[in-house]
Amino acid sequence: MQQQNIQPFLKNLVLIGGGHSHAIALKMFAMNPLPGIRITLITSNSYTPYSGMLPGHIAGFYTHERCHIDLRKLASFAQAQLYIDCVTGIDLKNNRVICANRPDVSFDLLSIDIGSTPAIISVPGATKYAIPAKPVGNLLHHWYELVEKISYNPQKPVKIGIVGGGAGGVELALSMLGNLQQYEPNLDIHLFGKDKRLMPNANPLLGNLLRRIFIKRGIIVHLGETVCQIAPEGDIENYIVICESGKTVECNYIFWVTQASAPKWLESTGITTDKRGFILVNDNLQSLSHPQVFAAGDIATVKNHPRAKAGVFAVRQGKPLFENLRRSLLGKTLKKYVPQKDYLSLIGTGDGSAIATRGSFTLPPSTLLWHWKDYIDRKFMDKFRDLPEMGNGALGIGHRAWEGKQTIQNLQMPCAGCGSKVGGNVLETVLRRIQLEQPVNQREDIIIGLNSPDDAAVMKVPTGKVMVQTIDYFTSLINDPYIFAQITVNHCLSDIFAMGAIPTSVLALATIPYGKSSTVEETLFQLLSGALKQLNQAQVSLIGGHTIQGDKLAFGLSCNGLADE
């Protein structure tokens, strides 16, 4: 058979999280394709916020679209699969990612960039009554509601509490005030910090400067105060912030922007972490305990070079992460990455000005610094705008020669003489996995089906009924075989319903992209799992089918239904 344009999948690279590092790495995979590698991005949202622009968005300077990266478009450009789901665990023994709403996802190499969340669990009432700064989507949802309420009735007294005196809390307070001032509201903003100055990890000059700005703008600062409880007080949206000192402050909305923490599910994976639960990595951004795992951004702590959890490091780690993922996939020596010790921070003050600080050096607010920050942020985001619908990506269409080409050439490809069929062992393994996780619905009128497979399926047609049949077949509509199969099932069954019949059984025809057995198995498993989810809901039996390999994922069903004579 002709093979020169075929790029079979040899390895599965799975990326968990759509953080800055992964966004940059995906863009670089699109621009520097690696044939034979299938990339899958698993993320809970299809848009990921850029932290550098988020305060400006809250202040009203940027639209939602301008400060978010479209991961669907980016994944399409990189020809990567995109799974929208929440990760709940990782099986590092069997190299599988456990998701909340879909089958496990197998990997050969894994990278994690899921950011962090504010540590609020230990404070009574915080989880129930406070609004955490992350996930950002939830924060923005509450913020939009608050802006709408204040704009509708600006004279109604509103008290906002912000817990956290670090950079995040400071920028949030200034940005909220900058936006809400346009309504001339009856507004108080309280900021609580456990240290004696704002942004305690920065130089004292910056903390003192910020304190003066807060006083000038009327933001009430409670420094040296550790919040120990959030309690409801009478009416809805009325709470008491209780501090260890005994101080109490009444607030209507409480935003939690404290020290970052890692998700709890990481604890059960067995991966080595630091004391706060973040993944410990070496200078190559590779897990200390599991070499098949890489991590970057807030979720990672570089053991030899620990740094603050700041977006600047996530951005800087994007390129070295890409380089080491690429080298690992090719079996090459990894390259060390040493993060910088000092970095320039440009802090927006919510009014079209910004502060610049690095080390012991600080410049007061100016519009020139804001324009500089705005230029830097827009330049970064422009890298992810106006992307073509599909690039060369990991599939390597029209790719340049690479070190793994010989491996692809040596892969045994199925021949046309055997119909390019998927191997029996692969099919048996997939069906066995599916029966364990999602048993096939077997109707009483099915005499021979998947429970007792033979050369053909056998069905009964009850007296007084007629058989209604239809067939449909589609190439992949989206880059997620699990969802694609569900869409296909619904479309195929709709023709039976349109004839006034009840669907009873289906035969499947699947074309799986070329690859080694493990990658073919993973695709087929995701595809059939999605199909069976919809078939079982419709009480329709999968009774057989045919599976071949080809250059593009495709799926179809021959559907059987019954109707009255």
Regions found by a protein language model. Name each.
Residues 2-12, 79-161, 182, 244, ...:
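FAD-binding core/adjacent interface of flavoenzyme oxidoreductases
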Residues 2-81, 171-204, 395:
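Beta1-alpha1 glycine-rich phosphate/pyrophosphate-binding loop at the start
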Residues 9, 351-406:
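C-terminal auxiliary extensions adjacent to catalytic cores
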Residues 82-89, 180-283:
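A Rossmann-like FAD-binding core segment of flavoenzymes
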Residues 128-156, 248-315, 323:
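FAD-site-proximal beta/loop scaffold in flavoenzymes
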Residues 312-340:
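Internal hydrophobic alpha-helix adjacent to the cofactor/substrate pocket in enzyme cavities
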Residues 407-499, 543, 564:
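N-terminal glycine-rich phosphate/pyrophosphate-binding loops that anchor nucleotide-derived ligands
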Residues 466-469, 473-476, 483, 502-565:
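Glycine-rich anion-binding loops of enzyme active sites
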